[in-house]
């Protein structure tokens, strides 16, 4: 059937129907004369889209739902939380969400439900785009950026649920993370073939062991891992042993501490020839290269790294019996390491560095303050003498990020709020 018939049946505008096709929500066949020919299946899909959009569920989340990267419960649950934050549990839209799954299961007719696609939703980037992807501890996030207008076109956030349940340590499935990250990029590429570059960042400190073919031969042992603090045969922990032997302090969860513990306890995979971060491994996988390339910002997060010289402390590693060949190649510039679908991919950078780079307009004239559970302030500067609690971190192109972190942050605000809410100061 032709689009005018579809408009009458669904109550959607032509612009909205074309938008859903452009965004990859429906795939419309063509008649012999080249005109779009909508099927009954297309009508059913459009009716589902209208129900979901009426509930306020984003086009992004609908795409993730149709791609089976999110479940219906996921998208409805997310939307209910958004509505609860915006207008509370008693709103009409919240009540609509409560019955949405049943409406879809029943194949409910939607022509009686008033809905008009927002006009600004019908506009999206047509020029050159950049894609950034972030492999977080619990989610994979991606952003599509219009390079000419410097505007955000779309943002994706997908839980990866990758923790290995039968592990006594903090380990995550590499295959689950990489599969979801690649599917996210494929979904974006399908809608936006005009991507000019891809940038990658993610959770720091953790490591993935690799074999000679550049394949993962272990889970991701992430930054939360506590094996570095476990007592060993001499009753010292791996972190204490590193301090005693090298004089350098390193925290559990850092890649070198993890690898050192594994060496001492026979836990390094037999076919492992090296290790890298999870975002380095994603870049390797996309570019089909066999050796990891690690930016200084990530290498520093492994520990025993000389920030000023931009290299690992090889003498300290030798004292620990760590083979330097296990370490990834380190670069200080944000160079292109390969291509995916002819799109250049830059070496991955640390999440702190990426958040600074993406948040400020001028690197040299800005400071970034992040307040989460704790708090952090970052600014670009030169190597010098710093006080306690302040550290230099590698930035991009040989520059340094000066960072100060504190436990006091959002948790302190929450404590103050709780204190006053438990008092009767406002109700004498």
Stretches found by the model and what they are:
Residues 1-64:
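Basic helix-turn-helix/winged-helix DNA-binding cores
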Residues 50, 64-119:
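Short, charged amphipathic alpha-helical surface segments
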Residues 124-219, 271, 343-347:
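N-terminal glycine/serine-rich phosphate-binding loop of ATP-dependent small-molecule kinases
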Residues 131-132, 144, 236-249, 257-292, ...:
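Active-site core segments that coordinate phosphate-bearing ligands/cofactors
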Residues 154-157, 230, 331-341, 380-391:
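Acidic-glycine-rich active-site phosphate/pyrophosphate-binding loop
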Residues 160-169, 241-242, 293-300:
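Gly-rich Lys/Arg/Thr-decorated short loops/hinges at beta-loop-alpha junctions or inter-strand turns
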Residues 190-222, 249-253, 283-306, 331-332, ...:
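Short beta-strand-loop/turn "lid" adjacent to the catalytic site in phosphate-handling enzymes
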Residues 225:
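Carbohydrate-associated surface elements
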